[in-house]
Amino acid sequence: MCALPAIESSYAVFTSHGLCGYRDPDYAPLVITLTILNAMESFLWRYIRGAGLAYGASIRNDAESEQIHFILYRAPNAAKAFSEGRKVIEALAYGTPLDDGSRVAFDETMLESAKSSLHFSIADAEGTVGAAALESFVDVRLKRMGRGRGKRLLQQASSVTLDDVQRCMQQYIMPIFDASTSVCAVSCSLSTAPSIRDALQAHGYVMNDVDMPGGASDASSDSASDSGWDA
């Protein structure tokens, strides 16, 4: 945890083990799962941003580092946003009710919408000759995937089912919200640091304070220096 005097909001990243590269059989199912979760007006948007718990909340897969991240952006209190996100993800993964007794679930409309969104994203990424050439270069030379990676992904995504999405939720998404299988990094204001630290420790995370230039220790030094100058 890094407390800074120059910010008012809090920012957090929770990281867990993800897929074993782009060739992993679960790559397409996980892409579809994340497309559903990260969609505008979808679950993370509705229960975190819509509730005023954070300006942004998303889950990102990094196949190259084999990690998956839950990212909170500009949250008044990152621990509260994390707690709410955990409840929603658990409800989606296992069918448990939310605090108000309501239930949330994936449906076929969400699944087909995610597949359509993936089609648009891939087409948009290769929308010009230059963009298509760059994508081909990255796929062939850097990712070692050969040509037509986008086309193959679309073919694989077309057969993804709701059962695949449910399995990805339990296998890849839930571990991000478990302190025994994930780590977290938080940057926040000096005033919210104690409450965020205590709340995340209650979830099982071991929180260590990190001093950075412009951090809490510098703020104390500046304050002492200013007091001496005024005197």
Task: Please annotate each region the language model reported.
Residues 1-50, 208-231:
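His/Glu-based metal-binding/catalytic segments typifying zinc-dependent metallopeptidases
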